[in-house]
Structures are given as structure tokens and as C-alpha cells.
Amino acid sequence: MAFHHIPVLLQETMEALAVRPGGTYIDCTVGGGGHAAEILRRSSPDGRLIGLDQDENALRAAGDRLAPFGDRVTLVRTNFEHVADVADRLGLGAADGVLMDIGVSSHQFDEGERGFSYHHDAPLDMRMDRTRPLTAAVLVNEWEEEEIARVIREYGEERWASRIAQFIVRARRQRPIETTGQLVEIIKAAIPASARREGGHPARRTFQAIRIAVNDELGALERGLEGALRVLRPGGRLAVITFHSLEDRIVKQTFARWAKPCTCPPDLPVCVCGKAPLAEPVTRKPVRASGAEVKANPRSRSATLRAVVKLQAGEEAK
């Protein structure tokens, strides 16, 4: 299946990153190379881009798409949580901009055999990096009922989490749960008929939760944000695109902590903790897709862009 990728919030992201000729940029989730190609165009003639992705298919597609840019591009197969290690290994110095486009690509959803989609019957996998040992099948067949319920509740924000976990454990006693189709039917049976008619596909939240757990997406995001800030030069920018509230909450809270790290009691007239701001927001509010973009690319509807600029040591956030 050909890898297709429509970059969301493309112009808004380029503005947030303030891409300039000759700059050095890191695309932490290079995917099909849509954002990366635009960064390379805007940073011509000698701007450099390092593209990371843990999905070998995505990296192959990015390599094909970005081939015309020659040695201005370096692609590395790794999770973006290792961005600082990659920068060190490549002797990169400081980057002018870092982009993180979080979540599963359109291609991964559409590629049935990976197990991300509840619309295709496929082996229960859900790994973005297929060298990792934990699969969705391992999770649903081997984890304790309470832990499965916690994952579905916390990562899927699913109110029927306990009931779904109970039905999963009951079903696996009869035979192993090996396909997405089996799991979808179990979820449908667990959710009362009246509730199944609300809020889209009944398996959506559970599939999201299991995918997040299998790939440790939220932990990787927290580590990746810290690594991205570390590799930026003062004045460099970090732009992050998220697609659901759990990810956006982590980004929002992290950016707020960087802007106001002071831990002094609020009634203290002068800061004595010595924790200076690390970054400040590029825009006052998060950026979302326009009506025209949503019409052209419905998956952009849930996208949220936040960006910060790294401050000089001791510089005050505005």
C-alpha cells in the first residue's frame, strides 16, 4: 500500500517555526515528509533537516519524497523521545526549530494489517515500531482485568472501561483474542445498545487507549518535549501538533511550566527559587485548522498546534 500523507496546518506550522534560509530543523515525526518538504523549500538553499520516525514504512516514503533535496536531509529511524541523543550523535549543535506531529498517520489508520483501525479485520498489533515486544494482542490477552480497565479509562476516557475489560477477560477465557474484528465485537457487546448510538464508533476510544499503551505515547511525548527544548538554540522554536485532549494537555502543561517555572509561594513578593523561564508561547491561543482545511482534509478537524520559543538564560517570558 502506497504511503500517502496530507500535512495538517502546513502554513500555520511554517509560520510558528519561522523557517528561514540556512536554518537547521528537526522533524521528530517525519511521516510521509509533507511538513519536512516545506521546511526544506523554505530553508533553501542550504538549510538542513533531520527527520525521525519509528515506522520503517514512513521513513522509506519520506526518503523517496525528500530525495530531491539530497544531502540536506538526514533520516533516522527512532522514536522522537530520543531526539536529543540523535542530535548529539550527529554533532548537530543547536537547532533553529523542532516539529512534533503527534499521533497515528492517515496511512497507518488506512493500512489494515497494522491493526490500528477498527474498520479493518487484522492481527492485533498496533505497534508503530514493529521491533517492540508489546503488541495489542499481548495487552488484551495477558494483562490483568484491572490494568486493562485503567488503560481504557485513562487513555481512552471511556466511561464503560470496567465493563469492556470484564468482557475482554471473559472472551479470552474461551479463545485468544487475535484480531481487531474480534476485539470490536467484544467492545460492542460490552457497551449497552443505547450508548453505542452515541459519539461515533463504539470501539474508537478503546482502540485509542490500547494504541497509546502499546506505544507508550504519552511517556514518549513528555520525554520528547524535554529533549526538543534541550536541542534548540535560544530563539529557536518548538511546534507541536496534537490530535486529542490527552496529548494536548501534556503539551499545554509543559509549555506553561517552561514559561512560569517559579515554585515560590504565591504570596511571596519576590522570587527566591531562582528558576528562570525556559520558553514562552509563540501565539496566545492554540491554532486549529480552518474550515477550508477541514473540508479538504477532515482528519485535520481535531488538530491543535502549539508553539514556543526558547529563551536566553535569565530572559523574562512576556
Swiss-Prot record:
GO MF annotation terms: rRNA (cytosine-N4-)-methyltransferase activity
The keyword S-adenosyl-L-methionine belongs to this UniProt entry's keyword annotation: yes
Tree of life domain: Bacteria
Reactions catalysed according to its record: cytidine(1402) in 16S rRNA + S-adenosyl-L-methionine = N(4)-methylcytidine(1402) in 16S rRNA + S-adenosyl-L-homocysteine + H(+)
InterPro entries, per the entry: RsmH (IPR002903), SAM-dep_MeTrfase_MraW_recog (IPR023397), SAM-dependent_MTases_sf (IPR029063)
Keywords of the record: Cytoplasm, Methyltransferase, rRNA processing, S-adenosyl-L-methionine, Transferase
Single GO biological process annotation from the record: rRNA base methylation
Pfam families: Methyltransf_5 (PF01795)
EC numbers on record: 2.1.1.199
Keyword set includes S-adenosyl-L-methionine: yes
Binding positions for S-adenosyl-L-methionine per the UniProt entry: G33, G34, H35, D53, F80, D101, Q108
GO cellular component, one term: cytoplasm
Compartment(s) where it occurs, according to its Swiss-Prot or TrEMBL record: Cytoplasm
Main location: cytoplasm
HAMAP family the record matches: 16SrRNA_methyltr_H
Function according to Swiss-Prot or TrEMBL: Specifically methylates the N4 position of cytidine in position 1402 (C1402) of 16S rRNA.
Family to which the UniProt record says this protein belongs: Belongs to the methyltransferase superfamily. RsmH family.
Name by which UniProt lists this protein: Ribosomal RNA small subunit methyltransferase H
